[in-house]
UniProtKB/Swiss-Prot annotation:
This is Superoxide dismutase [Mn]. The lineage of its organism: Bacteria, Bacillati, Actinomycetota, Actinomycetes, Mycobacteriales. It catalyses: 2 superoxide + 2 H(+) = H2O2 + O2. Keywords: Manganese, Metal-binding, Oxidoreductase. It comes from the Bacteria. The gene is sodA. Its EC number is 1.15.1.1. Mn(2+) binds at H28, H76, D160, H164. Destroys superoxide anion radicals which are normally produced within the cells and which are toxic to biological systems.
Length: 207
């Protein structure tokens, strides 16, 4: 059975400073993300054993645990690619045009995404996604690691609003963290995800 693995980063832990500290990135990647990977693999093993035993109550429990930990692994894998020491500025090309079409302007999109991040209660993520059914962009709040995700949505840009992502540096002032986040957004990665979502997402749910 294949196992999930912790991805290497494309940059050093300190490369996103001063916006996100190296200490946070090291703990975030080597401890928190690693824990989600380990949790997903453990849940997968227990799920396989429960299925072989025909233990349906255990199956449901381990499916729930797998959804949480695998959600954490997927979200963080996108997160690291969404960031770059050479990030910031604004998107260009087809993504920029789609943002203008859906939100009115980049500034209006940024305000909406920022509000989703700052207004999230508890732990979770703010997400810019592509709706493969409606063929449009949208923002939403993702609760914990896997809840409140609309069906048919492909995530393009995410900001981690769990406290482990910012508390060591920004304490309880998460609005400052979200402001700093915009300085390291890797728009080339977001553009690449958008292109794949548009071109490869057609017909995945409705033929």
């Amino acid at each position: 059975m294949a196992e999930y693995t912790l991805p290497d980063l494309d940059y050093d832990y300190s490369a996103l400073e001063p916006h996100i500290s190296g200490q946070i990135n090291e703990l975030h990647h080597s401890k928190h993300h690693a824990a989600y990977v380990a949790g997903a693999n453990t849940a997968l093993e227990k799920l396989e054993a429960a299925r072989e035993a025909g233990d349906h109550s255990a199956i449901f429990l381990h499916e729930k645990n797998l959804a949480f930990h695998l959600g954490g692994h997927v979200n963080h894998s996108i997160w690291w690619k969404n960031l770059s020491p050479n990030g910031g500025d604004k998107p260009v090309g087809e993504l920029a045009a789609a943002i203008d079409d859906q939100f009115g302007s980049f500034d209006k999109f940024r305000a909406q995404f920022t509000a989703a991040a700052n207004g999230l209660q508890g732990s979770g993520w703010a997400v810019l996604g592509y709706d493969t059914l409606g063929q449009k962009l949208l923002t939403f709040q993702l609760y914990d690691q896997q809840a409140n995700v609309p069906l048919g949505i492909i995530p393009l840009l995410q900001v981690d609003m769990w406290e482990h992502a910012f508390y060591l540096q920004y304490k309880n002032v998460k609005a400052d963290y979200v402001t700093a986040f915009w300085n390291v957004v890797n728009w080339a990665d977001v553009q690449d995800r958008f292109g794949k979502a548009v071109n490869q997402g057609k017909g995945l749910i409705f033929g």
